[in-house]
């Protein structure tokens, strides 16, 4: 099975640089059930559209709405950075990352935990810009930024080590490190996600991705089912479940195809690149025949 690295990377970045139980309820912090932060309602709508509903097209439009009234929210520009990354506009990603940094700096003294979390996110975005525009040979130049990511995460942990927003971002970072360093222990890497991260639809999605990439489909299937329970209308999760079932093979292949076809019923809301990928994967599993939409 072909691994969709590009789109998975895009969705991971989106999650790194970033809930509620229903779209109409935007009064609550999308990460915390206690001690909620004052995250703008328009930004929260975009977050839920992107990650819970899997409606990338609507989320991009909602970000344009949010920026008019909530331009001081670092999460907003982290989400915008992820959309630029998805369409390979790395300069746009960098500019959005600079706004993440400026807004994070402005939070110092008001909400130091979120300030450090989004300073880490801005460093990660800048490091990504360097590697994407200058190639792997530039990785050494990005290393100080990577170290700064860890330093800022540690500063946030010193304030509240069990904060859900912090642990969601830290968990995805740990997971990515485990995926590129074979000697890393996956279960240790997933501990932040499993214990303290929220919301569930992003927490379990990350865990499912990690187990899928580690070729542990049974564990991946359990995790993606939990993500789907938290976000039953998200076609990206449906597609991920199809991938895991395809990996299991055998009698699961027809069910995997049905998951791909189910995801394609929401083609109009998907990231265009992801839509192309799902079509390709569904065609591959169907022996070269295009799937219905």
Give residue ranges: language-model regions.
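Short coil loop/turn residues that delineate tetratricopeptide repeat
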Residues: 72, 106-113, 162, 195-202, ...
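Short coil/linker segments at helix-helix boundaries
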Residues: 29-30, 50, 54, 81-114, ...
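Terminal, low-structured helical/coil segments at or just beyond the last alpha-helical repeat
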Residues: 28-34, 201, 213-215, 219-222, ...
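N-terminal leader/linker segments that initiate helical-solenoid repeat arrays
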Residues: 2-7, 13, 17-87, 94, ...
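Eukaryotic tandem repeat interaction scaffolds
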Residues: 189-227
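TPR/TPR-like (Sel1-like) alpha-helical repeat modules
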Residues: 100-102, 144-150, 191, 197, ...
